[in-house]
């Protein structure tokens, strides 16, 4: 009788121990975030040290480095190349297929540099005073590094995935998209096809060291170029003429630059101003509410105020024009017969381009001035990403957890490669690390001559990025 009792008890103890041990075997140890920070910095500095200025781009070395790191971890990786040295890297972690994939996208090229204007060499990835300095630190090798670390950490964790997670390090975002996202979207879309995409375009805004809010890019304006060509009468500079082409052009440029296209709001901008008003001092909040209110004059007054005090806000609610190039004349004593101006036009998505061009002609109101589009790398017009999606909800939760702040959807006045993916029906969201509002005016922001990022904010963003992707992709 005693033996009969011992056997079941021993069996249960062994079973319990076996089950507990099996659980330990199947469960990855907790992530050592200090080690992750060291590894993240190693990869970040490595990709920063590759000169991928575009033009010419030459992303090969950066792409090969990323490929090597991913493959060393046992992650399947492919390379796609339209032109020599313009490489796009695609890697994939397989999920169960219960949900459609999630794409993590970043670009390895950067804008050009004038080394003479940099305190630290722009491709040295110098660390000083808690910052990392270098071209690409906040556009966009921070996102590339975060996506890379997310892939590595997901692989090491062994977490079961309900969806594939795809990594895309693309070439050519800074002006040569034909070798990057256009090439991938048109010829290799099956390799990157996903339900959702996380890419650049957002940030956590800090002011005087304190977090103000998090921005998630859910829409963007569409870039176009307009050429004004004024024709006049040539002559001697000693006899001023009213038909001087430069005079005509100057008047046209001044007229069109001060024109105020109508205010146009979408889901993104309405929600942005609503949420911004909720966290702003009373006087500012009143202006933000006026923009989305029913009083047209109050809305226009608010936008006029923004045009002087916060130009980016004014640009976010209407199609915009900025005269950026003027050409005319070849010597001081000759009145030229022709002069030209190039206008940078950013259309609100949904604006009819031809209707807008006709409006420019109406505003110029001079038959001697030709108004036409100029060839440009025009991204497709696309609707805003949804604000009620699974991704946006997970982002809101993660920003609250990591930064204790509100999330504002934003419409970028600039352009990103997400436009090509949104045109394919993908829901795309732009995120990024915390940046100081003071950095831009001081010359420390993206595309500046002292581009930099706080080391602590890079590390915080890597952890944030990983947890967002984990929560979106892991098996439920």
Could you describe each region identified by the protein language model?
Residues 28-137, 144, 154-163, 343:
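Acidic/His- and Gly-rich active-site-bordering loop/insert found
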Residues 36-44, 59-62, 66, 140-143, ...:
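Stable alpha-helical elements in mature extracytoplasmic
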Residues 131-132, 138-215:
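Acidic/histidine-rich catalytic neighborhood of metal-dependent amide-processing enzymes
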């Amino acid at each position: 009788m005693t033996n009969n009792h011992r056997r079941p008890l021993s069996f249960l103890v062994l079973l319990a121990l076996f089950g507990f041990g099996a659980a330990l075997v199947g469960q990855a140890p907790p992530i050592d975030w200090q080690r992750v920070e060291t590894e993240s910095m190693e990869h970040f500095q490595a990709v920063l040290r590759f000169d991928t200025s575009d033009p010419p781009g030459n992303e090969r070395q950066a792409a090969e480095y990323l490929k090597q790191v991913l493959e060393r971890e046992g992650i399947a990786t492919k390379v796609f190349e339209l032109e020599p040295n313009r490489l796009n890297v695609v890697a994939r972690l397989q999920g169960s297929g219960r949900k459609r994939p999630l794409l993590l996208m970043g670009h390895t090229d950067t804008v050009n540099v004038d080394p003479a204007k940099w305190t630290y060499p722009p491709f040295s990835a110098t660390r000083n005073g808690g910052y990392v300095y270098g071209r690409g630190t906040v556009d966009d090798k921070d996102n590339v590094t975060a996506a890379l670390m997310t892939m590595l950490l997901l692989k090491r964790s062994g977490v079961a995935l309900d969806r594939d997670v795809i990594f895309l390090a693309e070439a050519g975002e800074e002006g040569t998209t034909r070798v990057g996202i256009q090439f991938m979207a048109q010829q290799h879309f099956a390799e990157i096809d996903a339900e959702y995409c996380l890419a650049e375009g957002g940030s956590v805004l800090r002011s005087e060291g304190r977090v103000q809010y998090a921005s998630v890019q859910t829409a963007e304006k569409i870039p176009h170029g307009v050429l004004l060509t004024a024709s006049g009468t040539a002559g001697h500079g000693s006899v001023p003429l009213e038909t001087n082409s430069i005079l005509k052009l100057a008047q046209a440029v001044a007229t069109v630059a001060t024109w105020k296209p109508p205010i146009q709001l979408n889901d993104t901008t309405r929600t942005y101003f609503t949420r911004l008003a909720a966290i702003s001092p009373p006087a500012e909040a009143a202006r933000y509410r006026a923009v989305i209110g029913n009083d047209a004059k109050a809305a226009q007054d608010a936008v006029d105020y923004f045009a002087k005090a916060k130009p980016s806000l004014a640009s976010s609610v209407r199609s915009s024009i900025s005269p950026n190039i003027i050409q005319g004349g070849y010597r001081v004593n000759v009145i030229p017969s022709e002069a030209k101006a190039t206008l940078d036009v950013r259309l609100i998505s949904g604006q009819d381009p031809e209707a807008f061009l006709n409006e420019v002609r109406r505003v110029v109101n001079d038959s001697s001035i030709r108004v036409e589009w100029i060839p440009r790398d025009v991204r497709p017009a696309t609707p805003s990403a949804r604000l009620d999606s699974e991704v946006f909800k997970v982002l809101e939760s993660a920003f609250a957890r990591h930064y204790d702040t509100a999330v504002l959807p934003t419409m970028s006045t600039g352009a990103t490669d997400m436009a090509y993916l949104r045109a394919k029906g993908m829901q795309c969201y732009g995120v990024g690390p915390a940046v100081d509002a003071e950095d831009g005016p001081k010359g420390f922001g993206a595309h500046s001559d002292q581009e930099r990022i706080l080391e602590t904010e890079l590390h915080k963003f890597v952890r944030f990025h990983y947890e967002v992707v984990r929560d979106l992709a892991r098996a439920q």
